């Protein structure tokens, strides 16, 4: 159902619960996350006036050096979730699952601060989350070792020129923008539909020498533009913040790629399945797009550990399908072009 622009996130959640009463706990959890996001947005917006938010501290669960803002965001979201109907939280900033309310119905996977490398230079950062039902039993990890299709909701926050809250409860994807006059998230993009094709891709091209054949071939053909097999010119974008690239794809289409590569520890890429790729995949699919790991649908993947990684390709359906053709052999393999050959501008 189309909703009036400018209506609040609270109004939207009320309508979703009226449509599906079983979503009441999910809606309450989203309200808590949105309140925390407003607080984090205020801190991000102050920049260096809030202190050295890029100051390095300890290492997180994945071995990355934590920045001061990573710790601030993690703490604020955990405080918010303590007041929500949440039993367990899997956070990028915690090695193990954190148990909150025993007997509560939901489990939340969250990256409190996506795009940490952007903190010190005033660029976009964000938050990503996915909400799932609790799996009964004594193992706190069990709730997260299920397919992404079990998510009841997913969302991300973009802390940029505007603060946006992008969310789905399985009934379409919507963008709410923070109105700073009253600190309320208001609807600005309703029931989004990703265009099926667009001439824009996002990838970190500095890793070209590490990519496998299908990715090299796909990007090579995009670079050839109107003179190559794609018959049109492409633009490349890369922000080093998954949330920013995801929001751009939602609004104007295109494709995002973070593939696995041949660097040590990167066979499954760098993004984490539970609190990065699965939530983004849910949002993208709910907007009519596609999301794959190159071999299959992201939402059908089942994590075997909390911080498991996953390759990710998402965006306009025709482009995602095009990438899939390179992976399954329906397009020629890499190594046929001087662009990525031994004598080319970009050596493999």
UniProtKB/Swiss-Prot annotation:
Pfam families: FBPase, FBPase_C. GO terms for molecular function: fructose 1,6-bisphosphate 1-phosphatase activity; magnesium ion binding. The keyword Cytoplasm applies. Keywords: Carbohydrate metabolism, Cytoplasm, Hydrolase, Magnesium, Metal-binding. Binds 2 magnesium ions per subunit. It comes from the Bacteria. Pathway: Carbohydrate biosynthesis; gluconeogenesis. Its cofactor is Mg(2+). The keyword Nucleotide-binding does not apply. It is found in: Cytoplasm. CDD domains: FBPase (cd00354). PROSITE patterns: FBPASE. GO terms for biological process: fructose 1,6-bisphosphate metabolic process; fructose 6-phosphate metabolic process; fructose metabolic process; gluconeogenesis; sucrose biosynthetic process. Mg(2+) 2 binds at residues 111, 114, 276. Mg(2+) 1 binds at residues 92, 111, 113. PANTHER family: FRUCTOSE-1,6-BISPHOSPHATASE-RELATED (PTHR11556), SEDOHEPTULOSE-1,7-BISPHOSPHATASE, CHLOROPLASTIC (PTHR11556:SF35). Belongs to the FBPase class 1 family. Homotetramer. This is Fructose-1,6-bisphosphatase class 1. It comes from Methylorubrum extorquens (strain CM4 / NCIMB 13688).
